[in-house]
C-alpha cells in the first residue's frame, strides 16, 4: 500500500513540474524583432500596421555589455533559446 501511494505521489509531482518548463524555440528575423518588442516594451504589432515605422528602438543601440557577448541572433536564431534568454537582452 505504501508503495502504491509513493508511486502515485511521484507521478503527480513529475506531472506538475513537467508542465512548467519553458520550451526553447528559434527566433529569427521579424519574429525575433516582434518578440523582443513584446518582451521589452509590451508592444504588440499588427502585421499591416505602420504605426511604429520610424520609432527609435533602444534595444538596437550598442552597449558595452552587448558588444562583449554573442549577438541575439547567434544565441536565439542559430540555436533555440527561451524567453528568459531573450529578456536578458532588454
Swiss-Prot record:
SMART domains: IlGF (SM00078). GO terms for cellular component: extracellular space. Keywords: Cleavage on pair of basic residues, Disulfide bond, Hormone, Secreted, Signal. InterPro entries: Bombyxin (IPR017097), Insulin-like (IPR016179), Insulin-like_sf (IPR036438), Insulin_CS (IPR022353), Insulin_family (IPR022352). One of its GO terms (molecular function) is hormone activity. Residues 1-19 form the signal peptide. The keyword Signal applies. It is found in: Secreted. It comes from the Eukaryota. Disulfide bonds join 28-77, 40-90, 76-81. Pfam families: Insulin (PF00049). Coiled coil: none annotated. Residues 49-67 form a propeptide. Belongs to the insulin family. Heterodimer of a B chain and an A chain linked by two disulfide bonds. This is Bombyxin G-1. It comes from Bombyx mori.
Amino acid at each position: 500500500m505504501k508503495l502504491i501511494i509513493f508511486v502515485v505521489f511521484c507521478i503527480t509531482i513529475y506531472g506538475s513540474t513537467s508542465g512548467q518548463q519553458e520550451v526553447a524555440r528559434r527566433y529569427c528575423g521579424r519574429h525575433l524583432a516582434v518578440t523582443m518588442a513584446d518582451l521589452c516594451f509590451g508592444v504588440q504589432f499588427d502585421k499591416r500596421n505602420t504605426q511604429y515605422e520610424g520609432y527609435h528602438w533602444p534595444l538596437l543601440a550598442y552597449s558595452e555589455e552587448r558588444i562583449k557577448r554573442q549577438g541575439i541572433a547567434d544565441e536565439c536564431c542559430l540555436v533555440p533559446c527561451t524567453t528568459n534568454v531573450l529578456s536578458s537582452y532588454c
